[in-house]
Amino acid sequence: MSKTFNIYCDESTHMMHDGHPYMLLSYTSIAYPKIRKAKDAIKAIKERHNYTEEFKWTNVHQATYKVYADLIDWFFMNDLEFRAIIIDKSEIDESRKDYTYNDFYYKMYYQLLHQKVNSENTYNVYLDIKDTCSSAKLARLKKIMENNSSIRTLQFIRSHESVFVQLADVFMGAINYNLRLEKGDVQGTMKAKLSLIEKIKKHSNISLNSSTLLSRRKFNLFFISLK
């Protein structure tokens, strides 16, 4: 029996010259009939902690730790999925003929979505609006995904409108921060962020620095090697 899922995409440090070593593209996925209940549960978490801001990795600090800890616990106890693609930008070779950074970016979005979309189901895909190029970006993504008949909707959404986009931002931030810690790019003095990273590692039973099996659905990571 066919099911409908909503996929909420986000991206982090994806610009070519933003000073960050990794590009991350990700999504949070949830079955359409479960959206209302999930929204209500997340709203209750925010109210319990008197938290009124968007969920963002940049908003994680000691005073907000408990609400983020509850959010992560809730995710792993409920029927949602997270997937991320991670690329070391230093490995991207723009010297290849007819190949640009933007070409690579869209190919990675294709990999993010195509590998986990089941032809037996239908999907509504929402992408976080990032910049003034959003319209052109959407048109190109639609062109790339046009042969995938399972995708019913592909449109933009603003992050403040979707707690599921915000959830993807938190997980990406944790993955990125963990990688930069290992690389020595950050000192790791933010105890709240370190504690959340350890919580995610414990729940997912992975290190956050290597690929998981494609069949692993709850928390799926794909580190793309271009060497």
Regions found by a protein language model. Name each.
Residues M1-K227:
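Phosphate-ester processing/binding pockets and catalytic centers
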